[in-house]
A protein has these predicted regions:
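PLP-dependent amino-acid enzyme catalytic core
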Residues: 1-263
Length: 263
């Protein structure tokens, strides 16, 4: 396959059957350019924000992310030539930190936790303070930016084109952007499809748990505005150890995933 633009390596990911007994499929979003479903949002956001005149070549981009969206934005900013500041947790994985830095981003580390041990509120406050104190800075705000959740229309459309019938879709949630965008397109074509949001124990999105969350990439410490756009039927809370166990199960099938996919 010949690629004219490197960002064309985002989207149109493989759909793999992972269970012989039932028709159970996994969308392999790790095959995207920077390795995750968040590549869709980073690309869509940057391209549309440029087209709409919201950001220019000299605009500094800032975001709160210790994971895949930070990596994806760092990559897109590298391609576009924008400076990028990524506000992260102190417990960010060494691999993620090195990738973000390798792609040219500046990293700011949060230090204050909320009552449940989460750093997300401090990360967001750091971003708010920065954009107040500096000019020509754009906060991509993955928790409520319409560019983020609308980016996942493409994911929903791909699933609808690849499958003749969809009965259930399970979507891991954090910013709830993937859930919102994909659910819109799936419900358009398959209105009877049950869409299930999958959260992790210790997250605050659906239940006010006082349990500390240890796994990154799924769940968060508040209810993102993106959730208001989601067309989901139910949610389920997954134990962290069960998520890890399912990662190992998928690994036995040759599919390497993180905890959000395991959940």
């Amino acid at each position: 396959m010949r690629i004219q633009n490197i960002t064309d390596m985002i989207g149109n990911t493989p759909l793999v059957r992972v269970n012989d007994k039932v028709k159970y499929y996994a969308k392999i979003e790790g095959s995207n350019l920077f390795g995750s479903v968040k590549d869709r949002a980073a690309r869509y956001l940057m391209e549309n924000a440029y087209n709409d005149g919201i950001i220019k070549n000299d605009t500094v981009i800032i975001e709160s992310s210790s994971g895949n969206f930070g990596i994806a934005l760092a990559g897109m900013c590298k391609i576009k030539g924008n400076s990028f500041i990524c506000v992260v947790d102190p417990n960010i994985t060494e691999v993620n930190r090195k990738i973000i830095e390798l792609l040219g981003a500046e990293i700011i580390i949060a230090s204050k936790t909320d009552e449940n041990g989460n750093y997300v509120q401090d990360r967001i406050q750091i971003v708010r303070d920065y954009i107040t104190e500096h000019e020509n800075v754009y906060w991509t705000n993955q928790y409520e930016n319409q560019y983020v959740w609308k980016a996942y229309f493409s994911l929903g459309e791909e699933l609808c084109n690849e499958l003749e019938q969809i009965d259930y879709v399970f979507v891991a949630v954090s910013t709830c952007g993937t859930l919102a965008g994909a659910s819109w397109k799936i419900k358009e074509q398959f209105p009877d499809c049950k869409i299930i949001a999958v959260d992790i124990a210790g997250s605050q999105i659906f239940e006010r748990s006082k349990k500390k969350k240890h796994i990154s990439g799924i769940g968060t410490g508040f209810v993102p505005q993106n959730l208001t756009h989601a067309k989901y039927d139910d949610y389920m809370i997954i134990n962290e150890m069960d998520a890890v166990s399912e990662c190992n199960n998928l690994l036995s099938k040759g599919i390497v995933v993180g905890a959000s996919s395991g959940a």
